[in-house]
Amino acid sequence: MQTLAKFHRVDPKSVGLETFGKPSGYYDRQISTFSTVSKAQAQAVDVETKEPVGELPHFMETVRFFSNKSTQPKDRGTLVHGDYKIDNMIFHKTEPRVIGILDWEMATVGHPLSDFCNLTSPYYLDGTDHTTDQFQPDRIPGLPRREDCVRWYREVGGWDPTPDLPWGDAFFAWRLSIILQGVKARYALRQASSAQAHEHAKKTTPFALAAWERVKAVQNTMRQKGKL
């Protein structure tokens, strides 16, 4: 978390990355890109069953929610990794610290909330096959709580993501469902290279439904606050 916070504090201009990405509107661009991709993927037809992949559950309702400016987090622009997770970190052999970060293909200038929700997704996507027996946060002694992660990030980064987490969590789940829908589409066309593609494809709907449940939770909270 501290490494992520330090990364987000880097001024793009100070390292020659002022043209690395647009300084604002990150989530708007993500919504546009992923909704377009999802619509295309939904049209893929299985070569054997002739059944289309189909639209994600509550797709248009979810898009409308994320596109609603009154529900979106305050716009921010920092360097973002795009796939920040433990798998993409190199740790020191004997010391508890990160010494390298891998896989920068999706890096850009964007909203720091996206990286935070990506890294901490196992805390809120339990029940969608996103967690493993080896990592059950809040259950296995010694593993930090998400509140601890927020505190470590806030102390170094100077920004508290807590108010925006429900929205960010919902968006991450929706984004992930579209990525899995892509696996499903490639499997339907028998173009998927992974032997586990069919199993991954089965997770598309559960993740889309998980996103929708989180969207409804945010909507209910905002109704109670009189913002919707």
Locate each region found by the language model.
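A cross-family kinase active-site recognition segment
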Residues: M1-H58, R64, S70-T78, M106-G110, ...
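All-alpha amphipathic helical-bundle segments outside canonical DNA-binding/catalytic cores
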Residues: K22, D160-F172
